[in-house]
Amino acid sequence: MQGARSAAAMAAAAADEEREVRRAVEEKPVVVVGRRGCCMAHVARRLLLGQGANPAVLEVGDDADPAALVDAALQARRRKDGGDKAAAGDGGGGAAVAFPAVFIGGRLVGGLDRLMAMHMAGELVPVLKQAGALWL
């Protein structure tokens, strides 16, 4: 009985995390989703702060499934856009999803590596402006 109860509690916690991520991605221009205490999520946040954006940072438990959380957020975006296919610019591209997951303007950018690549290529600031994350 104890195992069934803890499994139910874990399922409820996972559903709560999915709801929280989905809501944040729908409402905030920039969202970083990472595990609690993740140093790479901290680096992503600092990079975005350095560009003038103020990202919402959601920390999830160690047992959280990155693919499920990202998929929940992307499904909400697809429903909002009125389509079933991945929106153009969603950085998943069928690749494995890992934390931290960075969303800008409701679209999945990818992880820290993709965020850094955008910054180094000069693509990050225009995307942040388009998402309404910068007031410049």
Curated annotation (Swiss-Prot):
UniProt entry tagged with the keyword ATP-binding: no
Gene3D superfamilies reported for this sequence: Glutaredoxin
GO cellular component: cytoplasm; nucleus
PROSITE patterns: GLUTAREDOXIN_2
Recorded GO MF terms: 2 iron, 2 sulfur cluster binding; metal ion binding
Main localization (coarse): cytoplasm
UniProt keyword annotations, A-Z: 2Fe-2S, Cytoplasm, Iron, Iron-sulfur, Metal-binding, Nucleus, Redox-active center
Motif (Responsive for interaction with TGA factors): 133-136
Binding site for [2Fe-2S] cluster: 38
UniProt domain Glutaredoxin: residue ranges: 18-135
Recorded superkingdom: Eukaryota
Subcellular location(s) of the protein: Cytoplasm; Nucleus
Entries under NCBIfam families matching the protein: GlrX-like_plant
PANTHER family in the cross-refs: GLUTAREDOXIN
Function per UniProt: May only reduce GSH-thiol disulfides, but not protein disulfides.
Stated family: Belongs to the glutaredoxin family. CC-type subfamily.
Protein name (record): Monothiol glutaredoxin-S3
Organism: Oryza sativa subsp. japonica
Gene: GRXS3
